[in-house]
Structure formats: C-alpha cells, structure tokens
C-alpha cells in the first residue's frame, strides 16, 4: 500500500507537535518547582485577645524540644552522597569538624521554612535542641540555625541519651522536671519511646524543596501553648505519625 506524501507529512507534524508539547510541559513543571521552592510564606502572629492573654498567664510557659537531623536539617559528609540528595544540590552551609582526630566536612541542607519556623515558635516556647548526634557536630549545626539570635541556647547531645537495643532514647526529664510543659518534635519515634504522650511526630526530610511540614505544625503549636498539660492533647494524636 502506497503512502501519500500528505499522510506522511501529517504524521510527521503530529510527532513533532507531541515532542514540542512534552518539552513545554517539562519547562512548566521545572518553573512550578522553582516557584514552590522560593515562595514567600507567612504565618501572622496576631495580637492576643484579653481572654487569650488571661489564659496564657494562667499556664506555664512550655518547652519545645527540637531534633536536628531529618527534622530541621539533612546532612551528608565527605565522600557520602545519599541517593535522597540530588547530585549538584548546593548545601545551605558546610561544617568542618574534627572527629577522632580526622577532619570531616558536613554538607548541611536546611528543611524548607526552618528559619521562619524558629522565628515564630521562639516567641511562644523556650526552645531546646536535643540530638542523638555527637556534640561537636550538633553544636555546630545549632549555632548555624540560631544565627546569633540566642533562641537555641539550651542543647543536649548523644551523651545525654540512653542507648537501648541500638537506639538512642531521649529522656525528657533531663530537659525539664515538669513533663506537662514539654513537647518534643522528632522524626524518630524510637527517640521519644519513653515519652510518647509528649511527642509531635514529623516525617523525615531529606531533599524535597516543596516540603511544608514545619509550616503545617504552626497552628497546632500556637494552640498547644494554652493548655495546662500538653499530654492531654498529644496523647490523643498518635495518628499524627502519618500526617506531617
């Protein structure tokens, strides 16, 4: 069967149009990802009503305990690039520390909106860093996140954890004796095994530039500071392990 030049030309045009449309869609997706990554975000901290101020004066100021790795940041060191980090993705900062007499560089990526998150929650809570990492590394990361603002002064490290069955457990009683006022934000359920009713789970973060988990938590943290006992709320929300 002979194919007419007109039919061949039409098929060629259709094939070209399909390729062109695929390229346009690629450019649109790339631009959309850029818009998401660099969008301006806000969470308005409005003046409290007289009733809210009165309520807040009747309860203790709460303590928010913050994990570092995969909660606020993600890092990898020299020679190790995890598949979760896209090759060529620039780190937010580089740390140079000495571990066992060997210099090691850590390439640290900040979770989206972490600076804004810390700025807001530091107005509501006393912030405490509690990481299972070594102090020489955890302290350097906390210094960068604090950025001389003085909101991450209290810090606890691996030596303050308890090692059980190969996992580091964080004892919140070393942070504050009154656990009714303590909240921990951590991506690892094993870390707060001893205090599940004080925990807000958060999904682990590695590289997704469109992640909004920290922003999603702000309304809850805003409301939680008004409670007399945080456990009365958090004990009802174990299903949150899949939400954030």
Swiss-Prot record:
GO cellular component labels: cytoplasm; endoplasmic reticulum membrane; Nem1-Spo7 phosphatase complex; nuclear envelope; nuclear membrane; perinuclear region of cytoplasm
EC number: 3.1.3.16
Keyword Cytoplasm among record annotations: yes
FCP1 homology domain segment(s): 58-225
Sequence intervals crossing the membrane: 7-29
Result after altering residue 69 to E: Strongly reduces phosphatase activity
Class of enzymatic activity (EC top level): hydrolase
Keywords recorded for this protein, A-Z: Cytoplasm, Developmental protein, Differentiation, Hydrolase, Membrane, Neurogenesis, Protein phosphatase, Transmembrane, Transmembrane helix
Pfam families: NIF
InterPro entries membership: Dullard_phosphatase, FCP1_dom, HAD-like_sf, HAD_sf, TIM50
GO molecular function, one term: phosphoprotein phosphatase activity
SUPFAM superfamilies (alphabetical): HAD-like
Subcellular location: Membrane; Cytoplasm, Perinuclear region
Gene3D superfamilies membership: HAD superfamily/HAD-like
Annotated membrane topology: Single-pass membrane protein
A Gene Ontology biological process term: cell differentiation
Reactions catalysed, as given in the entry: O-phospho-L-seryl-[protein] + H2O = L-seryl-[protein] + phosphate; O-phospho-L-threonyl-[protein] + H2O = L-threonyl-[protein] + phosphate
Primary location class: membrane
Family classification: Belongs to the dullard family.
NCBIfam families: HIF-SF_euk
Known function: Serine/threonine protein phosphatase that may dephosphorylate and activate lipins. Lipins are phosphatidate phosphatases that catalyze the conversion of phosphatidic acid to diacylglycerol and control the metabolism of fatty acids at different levels. May indirectly modulate the lipid composition of nuclear and/or endoplasmic reticulum membranes and be required for proper nuclear membrane morphology and/or dynamics. May also indirectly regulate the production of lipid droplets and triacylglycerol. Induces neuronal differentiation by antagonizing BMP signaling.
Quaternary structure and interacting proteins, as annotated: Interacts with bmpr1a, bmpr1b and bmpr2.
Name of the featured protein: CTD nuclear envelope phosphatase 1
Species in which this protein is naturally found: Xenopus laevis (African clawed frog)
